[in-house]
From Swiss-Prot:
Family recorded in the similarity comment: Belongs to the class-I aminoacyl-tRNA synthetase family.
Annotated PANTHER family: ARGININE--TRNA LIGASE, CYTOPLASMIC, ARGINYL-TRNA SYNTHETASE
Record keyword ATP-binding present: yes
Catalytic activity: tRNA(Arg) + L-arginine + ATP = L-arginyl-tRNA(Arg) + AMP + diphosphate
Disulphide linkage map: none
UniProt enzyme class: ligase
Keyword Protein biosynthesis: yes
Subunit structure: Monomer.
One term under GO cellular component: cytoplasm
Subcellular location, record wording: Cytoplasm
Protein name: Arginine--tRNA ligase
Domain of life: Bacteria
EC number: 6.1.1.19
Length: 562
C-alpha cells in the first residue's frame, strides 16, 4: 500500500464516521507542493461543502477529529479547509523497512493481468527513423513497468510486411536481376527506384499489382523474394534493438492475412457494414468519417488487419489489456478501430484498449526533425551520433580517461541520454532534440541521475564495501534524512501513476526528484566516519537500489564510474 492509498483509506473511514450520509467518499489526496505544508494534503472539505451545507473548514475539522493520529507528527487544518498531514519519523522508519523488501521483489499487483503492448512497428524495406525511436522506447518502458509489478506482458512488433509495396519490389527484383540487395541500404535504394517506376510506368504498375495477387495466392517465386526482403530488413532492425537493449517479438501484418475474409464476413453478419462508393465501411455516430475495412477493388487495408489483430489478441493471446504505441497522427484511426471492435464484440469494454499516442521530435528551430534535404533522419545514424557526442563530452569533462574507458562508457551514456530526453518529455507533447542539453551533468538528464548513482559507488569504494546492507537499521534525525526517506517511499506512487496514465515522464520526474533529495542529503549529512555512518549508508543503499531499478525500468544502464 502506498502512502497515498494509506491516507486515502484513513480519510475515507474518517469521513464516513463524521458524516454517515456521504455515500462512497473518494478522498482527494495529493502530495504537498511545499514542504512547510507537510507531506500530503487532503482537499475533500471544499468538495463536500454543498452536499453537507457546511463551511469547508468545519468539515475538515470534523474529519480530523475522526482520524487516528498515531502515525503522524502533525495533522492540521489550514486555509479554507485543507488537511495537511506530516508523518512521524518512526512511521517513516517502519515503512522504509517494508519498502526495502518490496523493492527487491517488485511492487506486485494483487490481480496480475495479461498485457499486450504493440510498439516500434517499422516497415519492411525502409529505414527506422526518429518516430520509431519514440514508439520503441516508450513501448519498452511501459512493458518493463507492467512486468515489474507482476503482469504477464507480451511485447509485439507489428511490422509492416505486406501490401502493394511488395508487389512493386518483387517485380523490380524480378526484372532487374543485376541489382545486388545485401543490406537495408540497398533495399531502401531499390524501393525508391521501384516506387518511381511504379508512378511512371503503367505496365510496370500492372505487373506489380499482379505480383501482389501472386503473393497473396502463395506463389513460390513471389513468396521467396518476399521472405528475402523481410529477412534483410529484420536483420537491420534487430541491430537497432540490440543497441537500444529492447526485447520484442515479431508478429507482422502478414500473420493476420488468413483471418481477413472472416473479419469482413463477421462484420456483415453483425450488420455493421455499409457499402459506400463500392467500399465496405463501418460508420459510427460522432465520427465524420467511417472506418473502411475493404476497398472498392475488394482488397483489404490496414484497418482490416488491425481488427483481426485486435480480435486475435483478445481471443488467442487472452489479453486483458491491449496497448498500441504510435504517433498522435493516428489517433482518429484508433478511435474508429476501437469503436468498431467494441461494436463487433472483439473488445470486452473500453478499458481493454489504449492508444498511447506521442508527439513530434523537433529541431532547434521548432520544425520537424529531418535532414537538410527534408528526409527523415535514420535512427541508426542518430544513435551513432549520440555515441560520438558522448565521446566528446567525456573527453571534455574527463581528460584523464583512457581511450578504452571512453569507448566502454560512451555507448551507454549516449543511448541513455537519448532515451531519457525522450521519456522525460510528456509523450503527447512535441519536444526539441538537443544533444547538448541531453548530455549535461546537471538538470533533468540521464547524466544527472547516473552521477548520483556513481557517487554512491564512490562511497562504497572509499569504505571498501562491496555491497551496501539493505537490512541495516535506519535512524531519521535530520531534515534531509526525513526528506530523503519520504522521497524513497513515493517510488510506488510514481509506478502507479505511470501505469495509470501510460506516461513514462512520471517515472523520470520521480527519479529526478529523488536524485535532488539525495544530493541535499549528501551535502547536509556527513556519512563517512560519522557516528551515524551505518544508518546513513542504509539510506544510500535504498537510493542506490531505487535509482538502479528506476533506470532499468526506463531502459537505461548504470555505470560504477563516470
Amino acid at each position: 500500500m502506498t502512502l497515498l492509498s494509506y491516507l486515502s483509506s484513513l480519510c475515507r473511514e474518517a469521513t464516513l464516521s463524521a458524516f454517515p450520509q456521504v455515500e462512497n467518499p473518494s478522498p482527494d489526496i495529493t502530495q504537498s507542493t511545499k514542504e512547510h505544508f507537510g507531506h500530503y494534503q487532503c482537499n475533500d472539505a471544499m468538495k463536500l461543502d454543498r452536499t453537507l451545507k457546511m463551511a469547508p473548514r468545519a468539515i475538515a475539522e470534523a474529519i480530523v477529529n475522526n482520524l487516528p493520529k498515531d502515525n503522524f507528527s502533525s495533522v492540521e487544518v489550514a486555509g479554507a479547509g485543507f488537511i495537511n498531514f506530516t508523518f512521524s519519523k518512526e512511521f517513516l522508519k517502519q515503512r522504509l523497512e517494508t519498502f526495502s523488501a518490496d523493492l527487491s521483489s517488485g511492487f506486485c499487483v494483487k490481480d496480475p493481468k495479461k498485457i499486450v503492448i504493440d510498439f516500434s512497428s517499422p516497415n519492411i524495406a525502409k529505414d527506422m527513423h526518429v518516430g520509431h525511436l519514440r514508439s520503441t522506447i516508450i513501448g519498452d518502458c511501459l512493458a518493463r513497468v507492467f512486468s515489474f509489478v507482476g503482469n504477464d506482458v507480451l511485447r509485439l512488433n507489428h511490422i509492416g510486411d505486406w501490401g502493394t509495396a511488395f508487389g512493386m519490389l518483387i517485380t523490380y527484383l524480378q526484372e532487374e536481376a543485376s541489382e545486388d540487395v545485401g543490406n537495408l541500404e540497398d533495399l531502401t535504394a531499390l524501393y525508391k527506384k521501384a516506387h518511381a517506376r511504379f508512378a511512371e510506368d503503367v505496365e510496370f504498375k500492372k505487373r506489380s499489382q499482379a505480383n501482389v495477387v501472386a503473393l497473396q495466392s502463395g506463389d513460390p517465386s513471389a513468396l521467396n523474394l518476399w521472405k528475402h526482403i523481410c529477412e534483410i530488413s529484420e536483420r537491420a532492425f534487430q541491430k537497432i534493438y540490440d543497441i537500444l537493449g529492447v526485447a520484442i517479438e515479431k508478429r507482422g501484418e502478414s500473420f493476420y492475412n488468413p483471418f481477413l475474409p472472416e473479419i469482413i464476413q463477421d462484420l456483415e453478419n453483425k450488420k455493421l457494414i455499409t457499402v459506400s462508393d463500392n467500399a465496405k465501411c463501418v460508420f459510427h455516430e460522432g465520427f465524420s468519417i467511417p472506418l473502411m475495412v475493404q476497398k472498392s477493388d475488394g482488397g483489404y487495408n490496414y484497418a482490416t488487419t488491425d481488427l483481426a489483430a485486435m480480435r486475435y489478441r483478445v481471443e488467442k493471446d487472452h489479453a486483458d489489456k491491449i496497448i498500441i504505441v504510435t504517433d498522435m497522427g493516428q489517433s482518429l484511426h484508433f478511435q474508429l478501430l476501437e469503436a468498431t471492435a467494441l461494436a463487433a464484440g472483439y473488445l470486452r469494454d473500453k478499458e481493454t484498449f489504449s492508444h498511447v499516442g506521442f508527439g513530434l521530435v523537433l529541431d532547434s528551430e521548432g520544425k520537424k526533425f529531418k535532414t537538410r534535404s527534408g528526409e527523415n533522419i535514420k535512427l541508426k545514424e542518430l544513435l551513432n551520433t549520440a555515441v560520438d557526442q558522448a565521446v566528446a563530452t567525456l573527453k571534455e569533462h574527463r581528460p584523464e580517461m583512457s581511450e578504452e574507458e571512453i569507448s566502454q562508457r560512451a555507448p551507454i551514456l549516449g543511448i541513455n541520454a537519448i532515451k531519457y530526453a525522450d521519456l522525460s518529455s510528456h509523450r503527447v507533447s512535441d519536444y526539441v532534440f538537443s544533444f547538448e542539453k541531453m548530455l549535461r551533468f546537471e538538470g533533468n538528464t540521464a547524466m544527472f541521475l547516473l552521477y548520483a548513482y556513481v557517487r554512491i559507488q564512490g562511497i562504497k569504494r572509499r569504505l571498501n564495501i562491496e555491497k551496501l546492507n539493505l537490512e541495516a537499521v535506519v535512524n531519521i534525525q535530520e531534515p534531509a534524512e526525513e526528506a530523503l526517506a519520504l522521497a524513497l517511499l513515493r517510488f510506488p506512487e510514481a509506478i502507479d501513476v505511470t501505469l495509470k496514465e501510460l506516461c513514462p515522464h512520471f517515472l523520470t520526474d520521480y527519479l529526478y526528484m529523488l536524485t535532488n533529495k539525495f544530493n541535499a542529503f549528501f551535502r547536509d549529512c556527513h556519512i563517512e566516519g560519522s557516528p551515524y555512518q551505518q544508518e546513513r549508508l542504509y539510506l544510500c543503499a535504498l537510493v542506490e537500489k531505487t535509482l538502479a531499478t528506476g533506470m532499468h525500468l526506463l531502459g537505461l544502464q548504470t555505470l560504477d564510474r563516470l
